[in-house]
Curated annotation (Swiss-Prot):
Upper lineage: Archaea, Methanobacteriati, Methanobacteriota, Methanomada group, Methanobacteria
A biological process from GO: thiamine biosynthetic process
Named cofactor requirement(s): [4Fe-4S] cluster
Native source species: Methanothermobacter thermautotrophicus (strain ATCC 29096 / DSM 1053 / JCM 10044 / NBRC 100330 / Delta H) (Methanobacterium thermoautotrophicum)
InterPro entries: ThiC, ThiC/Bza_core_dom, ThiC/BzaA/B
Gene: thiC2
Cofactor binding: number and manner: Binds 1 [4Fe-4S] cluster per subunit. The cluster is coordinated with 3 cysteines and an exchangeable S-adenosyl-L-methionine.
Gene Ontology MF terms in the entry: 4 iron, 4 sulfur cluster binding; carbon-carbon lyase activity; zinc ion binding
Protein name: Phosphomethylpyrimidine synthase 2
Amino acid sequence: MTQMEEARKGNITPEMEEVARKENLDIQMLIRGIANGRIVIPSNINRESSPCGIGENLSTKINANIGSSSKMEDIELEVDKALAAVEYGADAVMDLSTGPMLRDVRKAVLEAVDVPVGTVPIYEAGVEAFMSDGAVVDMDEDDMFRAIENQARDGVDFMTVHSGITLETVERAQRSGRIMGIVSRGGAFLAAWIMQNQEENPLYSNYEYLLEVAYEYDVTLSLGDGLRPGCLADASDIPQISELLTLAELVERARDADVQCMVEGPGHMPLDQIAANMKIQKEVCDGAPFYVLGPIVTDMAPGYDHISAAIGGAVAAMNGADFLCYVTPAEHLAIPGVQDVIEGVIASRIAAQAADAARKLPGAWDSELEMADARRSFDWDKQFKLAFDSKKPYEYRMQCPIEDSEMCSMCGEYCALRILREDR
């Protein structure tokens, strides 16, 4: 049985117990959230991983994307990136490999990390069609579902499936006058296939079969936003919202089949539109967990998109987003390296922490109080221990060491805290 089915029967699984403990949440509240589809625990029956709850009343979670490309493929490097992401606090990892050895990368990542691992199976179907026949659009329905079944069997915990890309939504996108068109790679694969074959998207027309596979392995479906905006000017347009309405219907069908699912969201979006978009998704998708990429709030910061995404992510999480997909400094420019992954994870953790502290979640608020106490007490070691990145602040402090262990080189003997303490 899936986690959802167990919850609906009132059964408590080991995964539920662990999530309730981590979140300091009443187990019955957690069970209700899973049963009604507002919380998911991605946990494939073929793989053991550290359980992670995503959704209503839980702390904001972070995903880190890694993966090879046709231009750069190194299995060991991808494993190193996955391990670095987990070390710096990612709650999940997605392998988005599109290189010839994508299966080997996936299996290596699944073995290397103990957090939930996600994939986008349409990449495998498209890449194999390209390598064998010369074009992504040469994949057929069997290729698509074969990739999904193989990855489910391998132990993948959650999968992005672009079932909301349909004949109707593709035609609507073509008429929309978008500046950036379709920027989702998986969405583009399927849109091109639909236009080439003039047939309905198999992941939509045969959604019931997709649900059967997901149910068998308890794979959490991440309903992909293939029509997410690729620039601020395209945000909140008709293609984006029409796809969201399709995804809302698919959420209901997944729940009817006892299959866990979450919904993916934008994307590039002006700051003033984020809160409304989060609330629209939560309303039309009946509280399904919302998994957002960023959102990136300005297109003017290549090389610094992790900062842009953290700004958007904080606003999104404060208004209902449950799962933040990190963005690295290499976004839009190159495949990220290990250091890019680290910086992306830290930026997203800052966003998640800011939102969770604003929501007054006990764990987040308590850690803020701990850090404040450590600073007031000049407890540098504790400050470094509490920090998302303990190495960087330590290195800054060591750049200009001074004899007094309490002081730093910024204020020295004119430290406000010390002056007031000594006056008292």
